[in-house]
Amino acid sequence: MTMPQQPQVNVNISQPPLPPQQPPVRQSNLRTKRSLLKYVLLGLITLGIYDIWQMSEVGETLNLIATRRDGKRTMHYYLMFFLVGWLTLGIGWLVWFHKLSSRIGTEQAARGLPVTVTAATYWLWNILGSLIIVGPFIYTYKLLHAMNDLCADYNARG
């Protein structure tokens, strides 16, 4: 009677180890040159189209930067501007900017950057600041520069 033979396992020890996992390669660096002057002037020249595009780009960029960390997604601004904002008689815009500002502040804190934009910044500068006319401009300046800082940090550290 013959004994069944054990299968032979070929272990090749001389095989080189797998290379370490590389982080996903970013296709291009994120924009870091948002400015209030360009936002206002191009907004006037294009009758607001540039402003809509810029806020859409801010939301998409924030999704790219922060979704890994917090698991949230900001609603696309085109959907907010053309549909939800009008259907909710403006309340949708208030909620969208509140959440956007809060998320920017949270991401700044998580990355160790100075927190310059929060939900309070939105309510105090953009809403109450409307009474002194320059408040919304100050809020927009802070928002655009906070996004520039986040994008620069993302370009440097991922």
Task: Give the location of each predicted region.
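Membrane-interface extramembranous regions at the lipid-water interface
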Residues: 2-84, 92-129, 136-158
